[in-house]
A protein has these predicted regions:
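Conserved short alpha-helical segments that host acidic/polar catalytic motifs at enzyme active sites
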Residues: 1-119
Length: 119
């Protein structure tokens, strides 16, 4: 995922970095900042839709991580109740959705306010 002034542009590929390199070949990218990650599949099939980075629904938050979200099933269900839609089967995808929830809080809300997501 790369970042320009107003957008996050995300290109993912299944498998080796050479697969991603082929997808990027010949394209123009003016971004000066980006993130990427290769990871062994721990949740979900090793398919492109499960590849990192993962984004929120508005495509404003991109996340890569190399860990396991132990309570991702519970968080995913809570987020679905709140209207979130998921594009992957991975545990990581809950993270950008949680960040989006936090960013949507009114500015007067305290980050320490009780939240069903603080577990």
């Amino acid at each position: 995922a790369t970042v320009t002034e107003s957008d996050i542009h995300c290109i993912r590929a299944k498998g080796k970095l050479s697969n991603l390199r082929e997808k990027l070949a010949g394209g123009e990218n003016l971004a000066q900042v980006g993130i990427g990650h290769t990871r062994w599949a721990t949740h979900g099939k090793p398919e492109e839709y499960n590849a990192h980075p993962h984004m929120d629904m508005a495509m404003r938050v991109a996340v890569v991580q190399n860990g396991i979200v132990e309570n991702y099933r519970e968080l995913r269900e809570e987020l679905k109740v709140r209207g979130h839609e998921f594009r992957s089967d991975t545990d990581t995808e809950v993270i950008p959705h949680l960040i989006a929830e936090f960013l949507a809080l009114p500015s007067s809300s305290s980050p320490l306010s009780p939240s069903p997501f603080l577990e």
